[in-house]
């Protein structure tokens, strides 16, 4: 019998939390020099240690841009994080006992989008092979597709959609909370601002990043520019060297580069779903939500995805809220029970 962890006591959980450190071969030697050893945070429901024969489904939670595994563990006043929601829902018998696994997808640029990139490293492979493999090998999971779901918010919501489309057979369900989608509205409006910011550094991307990292405080333009560099590294890397990227606009004039933006759109869930009927058909739950005042227009993206999934003759649960992009953890109270309910239990 394990003694309950300090984190579990700090968060006032009835369940427990374990933190492992995983050496990921998928991330080894990445051009940004980001660590290949990553924390894997695992929530265990109450009673996990009491019955050594029982197995549990696992829900994999993906953080958003600028997040890491610690972000999902952190506690803020008057808010409830994903582990606290899980513990409460299990305690109140609104959700069957399940494991929740927090995946760390942070990079030097602020995030990986959970895709395989020659510039960032193979973050999709790291998630579905290294993290899932580690959890199945070390915890009593239902170690099949039917025993796993993936969820996330913002870039994590994008990651959840990307993984079920790119790696069918790993997860049986997904939930996307305000997930990145319909890039024509979500990302394109920022390109002119980013062009001007990089022009001030003569388009020396390494110099911009170094200046960004050296600051104690960053303004919104700098933050947006770093965010777009992270997306560029995920969607349109040019080579396997740090900052060797194809920007989605012409460096001299700022004109949109249709050839590069087409590479971004190849990752856009709103563009992809129409051609992914087989991948979507095997899922037991497809869940999307967003606030109707989302600052990145992701409510439109969610509507487009929902309609295109329905056009395939498939069901999708699509929720909208009178809300924006921030502080949406309350929606875990909807998605977590819905995901756990469709998974296999032993």
Where are these regions (language model features)?
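Non-catalytic cap/lid and distal C-terminal segments of serine-dependent acyl enzymes
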Residues: 1-346
């Amino acid at each position: 019998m394990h003694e309950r962890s300090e984190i579990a006591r700090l968060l006032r959980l009835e369940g427990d939390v374990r933190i492992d450190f995983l050496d990921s071969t998928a991330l080894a030697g990445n051009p940004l020099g980001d660590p290949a050893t990553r924390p894997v945070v695992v929530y265990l429901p109450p009673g996990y240690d009491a019955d050594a024969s029982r197995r549990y489904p696992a829900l994999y939670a993906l953080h958003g841009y600028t997040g890491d595994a610690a972000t999902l563990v952190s506690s803020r006043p008057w808010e409830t994080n994903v582990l606290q929601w899980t513990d409460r829902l299990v305690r109140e018998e609104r959700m069957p006992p399940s494991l929740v696994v927090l995946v760390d997808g942070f990079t030097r640029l602020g995030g990986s989008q959970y895709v395989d990139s020659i510039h960032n490293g193979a973050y999709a492979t790291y998630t579905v092979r290294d993290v899932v493999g580690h959890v199945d090998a070390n915890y009593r999971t239902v170690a099949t597709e039917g025993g796993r779901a993936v969820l996330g918010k913002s870039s994590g919501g994008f990651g959840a959609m990307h993984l079920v489309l790119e790696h069918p057979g790993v997860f049986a369900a997904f939930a996307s909370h305000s997930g990145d989608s319909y890039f024509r509205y979500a990302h394109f409006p920022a390109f002119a601002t980013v062009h001007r910011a990089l022009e001030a550094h003569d388009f020396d991307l390494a110099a911009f990043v170094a200046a960004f990292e050296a600051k104690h405080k960053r303004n919104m333009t700098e933050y947006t520019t770093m965010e777009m560099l992270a997306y560029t590294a995920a969607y349109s890397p040019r080579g396997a060297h740090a900052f060797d990227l194809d920007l989605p606009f012409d460096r001299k004039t700022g004109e949109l580069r249709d050839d590069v933006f087409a590479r971004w759109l190849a990752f856009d869930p709103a563009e992809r779903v129409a051609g992914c009927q087989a991948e979507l058909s095997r899922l037991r739950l497809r869940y999307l939500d967003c606030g109707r005042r989302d600052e990145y227009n992701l409510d439109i993206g969610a509507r487009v995805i929902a309609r295109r999934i329905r056009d395939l003759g498939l069901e999708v649960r699509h929720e909208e809220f009178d809300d924006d992009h921030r502080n949406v953890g309350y929606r875990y109270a909807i998605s977590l029970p819905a995901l756990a309910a469709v998974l296999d239990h032993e």
